[in-house]
Amino acid sequence: MVVKKYIVALDQGTTSSRAIVFDHQANIVAVAQREFTQHYPQAGWVEHDPMEIWSSQSSALVEVLTRAGISRHDVAAIGITNQRETTIVWNKHTGKPVCNAIVWQCRRSQAICLDLKAQGVEDLVRQKTGLVLDPYFSASKIKWILDNVEGAREQAEAGDLLFGTVDTWLVWKLTQGEVHVTEPTNASRTMLFNIHTQEWDEELLDLFNIPRAMLPEVKPSCAIYGYTELAGNHIPVAGMAGDQQSALFGQLCIEPGMAKNTYGTGCFLLMNTGDKAVESTHGLLTTIAIGADTKVNYALEGSVFMGGAVIQWLRDELGLITDACDTQYFADKVDDTNGVYLVPAFVGLGAPYWDADARGAIIGLTRGANRNHIIRAALEAIAYQSRDVLDAMSKDSNVPLTQIRVDGGAVANDFLMQFQADITGVTVIRPQVTETTAMGAAFLAGLAVGVWKSTDELKTMLSTEREFTSTMDITTRATLYKGWQKAVSQVSPNGDVG
């Protein structure tokens, strides 16, 4: 019998649906991508059409097999990784969504969260879920749908409606409505899942007034959930994780103290804390991760709102560059920023400050400051913000970081990676394959069906493209970082958080 040697990872993101074929050595064979429509019905509201999510993802799957030049019979399994928190509610008999998906960025359920805060339940929610009471997470979105979509509450009470994050929706569609399932990393972002008991929490369901029957079964992140006939063959759907946890697993940050930073539009930093759910006192979230041999682990998570978006701003709004790749060239033309700090609080500040009212500023301008200094300050700001979160992680976990693994578009910038190493004093490891989010899903699926035997075997497939080690002396590092903290304090009263 010929061994099926390919894994397909479905990477369902906020702006596009992608499918990536990996071979038995975890090399990328082919990629297909389909963008889909963003809907903004009101200020602060963000929606996706669940049927368009499905059509874009299913067509990307069919296309990638053609691009790879492989038969559906060669596919050992399909893994899924997805945008987290985005909420879909549909009728289980017709398969039709009751409304558009409410996207993680959507703030429409703010009033629900404020009402619950006024009831004094914030600490209870935090203790059970590791999350802050915020519209970002799924629970308030589900409640909003049940309270505002005509007939939804009645259908839900009658047991006719199903809820799912995007992973659940994709599996349900792939299996033609046979399987209603999620896994712990996605469940942990709903604000209905007790991360300590690893079960749906009745008290939280009562708090948000959500019927238990709507919720999917929670299975391990590495398991065969069902089979799809979509590509014309009986293919196992066999491994899932939310995008950031999938990237953490794709980087094999499976031991306590290992951390990764994904440099995208924002920056997402996760640190594995092993079997201990560390409660943060420094503005981080506690969430579920995947550890060695796919056991449930915990992680600390911090998000920086403005990462690569700062570079887009330099290009699109200020016109200082014509291409993001130019930033390294201009930053390298000067030895430092000439005392300039750019605090990119365009939509407030994320972890560890959590100040929605902070606004951006360029500080320290003198007559000698020029374009190169401002561009360099923008790149340095991404690294400073990442250090803010890494320092918080070290304080919360009592584990000093010695290295951080990186992925995402901005890691191609050598200046940024070197400055990240310099300002943290931590070794920055850039992998050969930077598609680590999809790779995490592929690893989980491959382990579930026996393509790979263990996480130890996976370690042999990860290769490092380059390591960046600090060349900055301790005094310079301390002086520069103190300047950053002072700059942040000028735009936010929370700036002295460190």
Swiss-Prot record:
Binding site for glycerol: 84-85, 136, 243-244
Domain of life: Bacteria
Catalysed reactions listed for this entry: glycerol + ATP = sn-glycerol 3-phosphate + ADP + H(+)
Keyword flag Calcium: no
Record: residues binding ADP: 14, 18, 265, 308, 409, 413
GO cellular component: cytosol
Matching InterPro entries: ATPase_NBD (IPR043129), Carb_kinase_FGGY (IPR000577), Carb_kinase_FGGY_CS (IPR018483), FGGY_C (IPR018485), FGGY_N (IPR018484), Glycerol_kin (IPR005999)
Enzyme class: transferase
PROSITE patterns: FGGY_KINASES_1, FGGY_KINASES_2
Record-linked Pfam families: FGGY_C (PF02782), FGGY_N (PF00370)
Disulphide-bonded residues: none
Family to which the UniProt record says this protein belongs: Belongs to the FGGY kinase family.
Protein name: Glycerol kinase
Annotated gene: glpK
